[in-house]
């Protein structure tokens, strides 16, 4: 048997971290079993679905490295398949037309609430006669198609994560709406609803394993009944834990950063984000190993090691993982990743003309980066011809003899300064002024950087020298 799994997002918003984590688990499972990973776009919600969201979802999956083998398939292009399935269920007496109005359904819910009962449809139109149906249609009522769910049946499956799961038919809310008739009343059933469309797609696409969030468990019970009613083999199911916020509630848009776009803009690398998402609910065989590629994770991935409990989102852990990936990159590799952040902040560096200097800058700040978006903050002392002196630096420059030290250093500077020459200037100045080297270095840092703390001073000096900014800054210090 070839393993076939799918990720089936709805294009009603940008790619969400929860959907992306589900995609990661499906991708890993497919690759581990040398199977197929299928992309299906569930776009039957015509009011909320947008083509730009479809593009965002596909771009997000590609950015994360989650390449799919088949698709994308769109549900709006498969309506005839759903209508055929609905007709089959009607012909078999497993579904029926329900003509209840919204007002009648609301009154039903209110009465149930008053009696402290869970809201459910009471199946009142399950056994309408043809004459009764005709009367409703003559009155202009629009029908929905309901699938019959017997209250006294049990739905049982062996979940690959949660083990044995049992649902009672009586807990599923009564006979389930699977489609609405069209506005003009034609017998084309209008728009099929989620549970019916999903089952038909999974049957046609020969999906062997459905891996999704635990919030779909009730849907799974309903869908198993539909598989059986359509005479199809029921796939294996695995329900992964939800991603939780710091308060232990399901992560939602109210928590702020939830879309993959958000994480990308914040400066997270796709490899790091995928690495972290893999650990959100899954424990690798070697629990001490936390940094790995998708391909390495696929070799050892199994659903048995997915946790049942919710996975709390940990920003500190994500930042640490991201920093590990960043610290492995060379300056040359960092430049194209950091350049957009410098440019967005108003620094007009060019990838070609400033390339060598930017590589040196990226090499200098690379070990300090946690996110790509840290680029400006970590390099801010080196980005302009003049320094912005804080009070601590100004106080250092006002000490007796310091400006004379700066003048001597300024006089000794040459273009294309090397590390050895720079060290020699410091040594010569220290001896000439008969002071401790620490005073010279501290004063030089104050003059060049505008602050007494920051990146490596000698490397910073060489970078500033390449643009002639060491001279302009030392002159600024002398005149301060």
Swiss-Prot record:
GO terms for cellular component: cytosol. It is found in: Cytoplasm. Keywords: Aminoacyl-tRNA synthetase, ATP-binding, Cytoplasm, Ligase, Nucleotide-binding, Protein biosynthesis. Its EC number is 6.1.1.17. A motif ('HIGH' region) lies at residues 9-19. ATP binds at residue 253. A motif ('KMSKS' region) lies at residues 250-254. GO terms for biological process: glutamyl-tRNA aminoacylation. The keyword Aminoacyl-tRNA synthetase applies. It catalyses: tRNA(Glu) + L-glutamate + ATP = L-glutamyl-tRNA(Glu) + AMP + diphosphate. Monomer. Catalyzes the attachment of glutamate to tRNA(Glu) in a two-step reaction: glutamate is first activated by ATP to form Glu-AMP and then transferred to the acceptor end of tRNA(Glu). Belongs to the class-I aminoacyl-tRNA synthetase family. Glutamate--tRNA ligase type 1 subfamily. NCBIfam families: gltX_bact (TIGR00464). This is Glutamate--tRNA ligase.
């Amino acid at each position: 048997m070839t393993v076939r799994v799918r990720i089936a997002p709805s294009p009603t918003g940008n790619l969400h971290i929860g959907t992306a984590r589900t995609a990661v688990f499906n991708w890993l499972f497919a690759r581990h079993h040398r199977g197929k990973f299928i992309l299906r776009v569930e776009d039957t919600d015509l009011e909320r679905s947008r083509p730009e969201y479809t593009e965002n979802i596909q771009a997000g999956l590609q950015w994360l490295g989650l390449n799919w083998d088949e698709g994308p398939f769109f549900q709006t292009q498969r309506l005839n398949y759903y209508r055929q399935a609905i007709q089959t269920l009607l012909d078999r007496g497993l579904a029926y037309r329900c003509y209840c109005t919204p007002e009648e359904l609301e009154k039903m819910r209110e009465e149930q609430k008053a009696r402290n009962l869970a809201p459910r449809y009471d199946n009142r139109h399950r056994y309408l006669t043809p004459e009764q149906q005709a009367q409703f249609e003559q009155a202009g009522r629009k029908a929905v198609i309901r699938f019959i769910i017997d209250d006294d049946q049990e739905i049982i499956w062996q979940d690959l994560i949660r083990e044995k799961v049992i649902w009672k038919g009586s807990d599923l809310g009564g006979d389930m709406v699977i489609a609405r008739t069209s506005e003009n009343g034609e017998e084309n059933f209008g728009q099929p609803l989620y549970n019916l469309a999903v089952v038909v797609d999974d049957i046609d696409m020969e999906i062997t394993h459905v891996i999704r969030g635990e919030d779909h468990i009730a849907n799974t019970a309903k869908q198993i009944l539909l598989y059986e009613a359509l005479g199809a083999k029921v796939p294996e199911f695995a329900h992964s834990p939800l991603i939780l916020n710091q308060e232990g509630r399901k992560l939602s848009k109210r928590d702020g950063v939830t879309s993959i776009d958000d994480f990308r803009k914040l400066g997270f690398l796709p490899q790091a984000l995928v690495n972290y998402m893999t650990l959100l609910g899954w424990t690798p065989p070697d629990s001490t190993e936390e940094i790995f590629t998708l391909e390495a994770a696929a070799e050892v991935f199994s659903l048995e090691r997915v946790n049942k409990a919710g996975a709390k989102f940990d920003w500190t852990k994500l930042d640490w993982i991201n920093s590990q990936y960043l610290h492995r990159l060379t300056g040359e590799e960092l430049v194209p990743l950091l350049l957009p952040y410098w440019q967005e902040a108003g620094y007009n560096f060019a990838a070609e003309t400033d390339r060598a200097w930017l590589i040196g800058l990226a090499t200098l700040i690379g070990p300090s980066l946690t996110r790509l978006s840290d680029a400006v903050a970590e390099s801010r002392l080196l980005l302009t011809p003049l320094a912005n002196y804080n009070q601590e630096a100004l106080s250092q420059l006002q000490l007796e003899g310091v400006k004379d030290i700066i003048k001597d250093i300024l006089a000794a500077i040459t273009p294309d300064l090397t590390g050895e020459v720079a060290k020699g200037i410091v040594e010569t100045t220290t001896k000439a002024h008969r002071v401790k080297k620490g005073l010279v270095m501290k004063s030089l840092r104050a003059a060049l950087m505008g602050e007494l703390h920051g990146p490596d001073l000698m490397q910073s000096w060489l970078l500033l020298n390449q643009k002639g900014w060491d001279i302009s800054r030392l002159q600024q210090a002398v005149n301060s």
